[in-house]
Amino acid sequence: MDYLPVEVIGNILSRLGGARDVVIASATCRKWREACRKHLQTLSFNSADWPFYRDLTTNRLEILITQTIFQTMGLQGLSIMMDDANKFSAATVIAWLMYTRDTLRRLSYNVRTTPNVNILEICGRQKLEALVLAHNSITGVEPSFQRFPCLKSLSLSYVSISALDLNLLLSACPMIESLELVSLEIAMSDAQVTIELSSPTLKSVYFDGISLDKFILEADSIEFLHMKDCVLELFELIGNGTLKHFKLDDVSVIHLDIMETSESLEVVDVNHFTMVWPKFYQMISRSQKLKKLRLWDVVFDDDDEIIDVESIAAGFSHLTHLSLSYDLKDGAAHYSLQGTTQLENVTVLELGWTVINDVFSIWVEELLRRCPNLKKLIIYGVVSETKTQGDCQILATFTWSIVQLMRKYIHVEVQFEYE
């Protein structure tokens, strides 16, 4: 270790990340202290990583963080993620940010202060490339002054902000490619909460825990969109057909429109979602490149509605991975049994049930027949703890049917996942 250049030692310390580990390691010898002072690139203070932080008074914690930060030169990554047990002095926190802002590329900030610290004002017009902001408040955004010319990634979690300020903040980031919005507290200006965001450079967007009346996103370069635990009346995506990956996870939306951007879709992943199948199919049908389609635990507005596998087979000829799980009602033998178009390129098939019945084995058999080049079949099932004699009989019949079926498809690998 004595022969390692201080620059290499600095890289080693930077990979440790956590301030406690960095301080302990840098105490090894003079050379390591020099590496920590001059060549440390990343430093992290996280109350979840080290319970000792919680045992310190706020003043002692401020001193510890201040001493550690001020012993460094040229930090590029700084993470200060503290729980709500401490409220720091705004002056102290501003001193940390002012000392490091000229060289910072990445900042993760979850610090409660009295009064509130305006991160945008302090870190704007600098070289920041990634900003993670949590449990904070943003007001009065001025794009001409609070500009982030190099910012590529922005994450806001549990942040209070108005719809106007959010749009202004996005416009102040001309290079932004990734946006994450988690459980925002949207300041309301009227009875209807509407957000309209526009960015020509956005490629990846993630929304979690967002509840609004209307959300309109205009993103000409978007490739990835993931929405989770959201409640919306209307969501509209406007773009140039660049969207490749679209994921919905436990989302409630009355009117969903991504049709304008769906031409390049390669992955559609929908989980716990209520849909009108004809409308949903029409929305994604423009894509001729779809490779993976996952419709899992979906519910229909109409009890008699089905997912039409014939339209999937005819419309998505490049599909290689198909996953389907929804309630197959007794007597509905027409589920997926109409039509003859095959899913020629599907090699992985995932099928699931929440309540098993006799229709399921028929459904599995028909889908196997539709996939002549299938390599892998995965069956997911929910088995209740309390089982009647009838439940056991249905499960036994299904198991026997699958055993018989797989004798015809010996080239297919079969997996069962029960919960």
Curated annotation (Swiss-Prot):
Domain F-box: 1-48
Keywords on record: Leucine-rich repeat, Repeat
Pfam family, one: LRR_At5g56370
LRR repeat extents: 53-82, 96-124, 133-157, 158-183, 185-209, 245-272, 273-297, 301-326, 356-381
Database matches in InterPro entries: F-box-like_dom_sf (IPR036047), F-box_dom (IPR001810), LRR_dom_sf (IPR032675), LRR_FXL15/At3g58940/PEG3-like (IPR055411)
Alphabetical list of SUPFAM superfamilies matching this protein: F-box domain, RNI-like
Record's GO cellular component terms: cytoplasm
PANTHER family in alphabetical order: F-BOX PROTEIN-LIKE, F-BOX_LRR PLANT PROTEIN
Protein name: F-box/LRR-repeat protein At1g67190
Organism of derivation: Arabidopsis thaliana (Mouse-ear cress)
